[in-house]
Amino acid sequence: MATGQKLMRAVRVFEFGGPEVLKLRSDIAVPIPKDHQVLIKVHACGVNPVETYIRSGTYSRKPLLPYTPGSDVAGVIEAVGDNASAFKKGDRVFTSSTISGGYAEYALAADHTVYKLPEKLDFKQGAAIGIPYFTAYRALIHSACVKAGESVLVHGASGGVGLAACQIARAYGLKILGTAGTEEGQKIVLQNGAHEVFNHREVNYIDKIKKYVGEKGIDIIIEMLANVNLSKDLSLLSHGGRVIVVGSRGTIEINPRDTMAKESSIIGVTLFSSTKEEFQQYAAALQAGMEIGWLKPVIGSQYPLEKVAEAHENIIHGSGATGKMILLL
């Protein structure tokens, strides 16, 4: 470390494992932006389920150790590297990715992954945009190729990606059904675009959905927990319907015949398969949503950096989401 280089607090992971491997350090050097990079003073950072999978070492993408988790930061530009002329010190921004990690007081990001944060949204809301909204947009528009008038079922609709999917789907003219496991979660889902909501903790909730949609079935299902729901999803689909798998935490047995009569599809989605051009498309659509007002992130649990392990525990094992989980700095 260079003499006199500024230090910051940051969460570091030195080995893969449970939430206990998240270590808060106060001796981490503040990064210096290089060509096409910016340094952001972080005010808030979103916590996403994928970050727990990466931390555990079970995800397809394994960072080099040690590393700092976190992609979705919101804050203020602190410094700008060469050729990052779209930004200046003091700009309010949010990110869809970081280079140095977001669970920190400062984060380094490539300029093409940084976006202006409108004044009407606060930093907590800014930290809730990145992975949730970009993933929901990719799932609905890019992968499902939704058309106005189609129906969509959003499983786990009260979480960050779920609420984003509800807001986007409503803006694009879809009929939206959502599921949530708590009364508060169901209320939030209805407030954010869903036409009807079902309690997925009820044993017969699938039967209730079937009764509600009738023989036609559902055109699109946004699936957050495929290892639990995929087989049931196939029974709910319309002819030509598609299940978009956004999340899964294990394996499941399905009958491929269930896809044949309806000529239905199962499509997996991962945000980071998107090209740079696709990210720019998503950003343009979402920026319009912020300006018009249909994109309005709902904030759920909030934690200080010191309680990051608790946040990781609760995002997987909590009683039910009611908005986007964030870390406050």
UniProtKB/Swiss-Prot annotation:
Catalytic activity: 2 a quinone + NADPH + H(+) = 2 a 1,4-benzosemiquinone + NADP(+)
Keywords: Acetylation, Cytoplasm, NADP, Oxidoreductase, Phosphoprotein, RNA-binding
Residue numbers carrying N6-acetyllysine: K23
Residues noted as binding NADP(+) in the record, renumbered to the chain: 53, 158-161, 181, 200, 229, 246-249, 269-271
Principal localisation: cytoplasm
Gene Ontology MF, one: zinc ion binding
Cellular compartment(s): Cytoplasm
Chain positions found as N-acetylalanine: A2
Highest taxon listed in the record's lineage: Eukaryota
Enzyme class at the top of the EC tree: oxidoreductase
Record carries keyword Acetylation: yes
Function, in words: Does not have alcohol dehydrogenase activity. Binds NADP and acts through a one-electron transfer process. Orthoquinones, such as 1,2-naphthoquinone or 9,10-phenanthrenequinone, are the best substrates (in vitro). May act in the detoxification of xenobiotics. Interacts with (AU)-rich elements (ARE) in the 3'-UTR of target mRNA species. Enhances the stability of mRNA coding for BCL2. NADPH binding interferes with mRNA binding.
Family: Belongs to the zinc-containing alcohol dehydrogenase family. Quinone oxidoreductase subfamily.
Protein name: Quinone oxidoreductase
Gene that encodes the chain: CRYZ
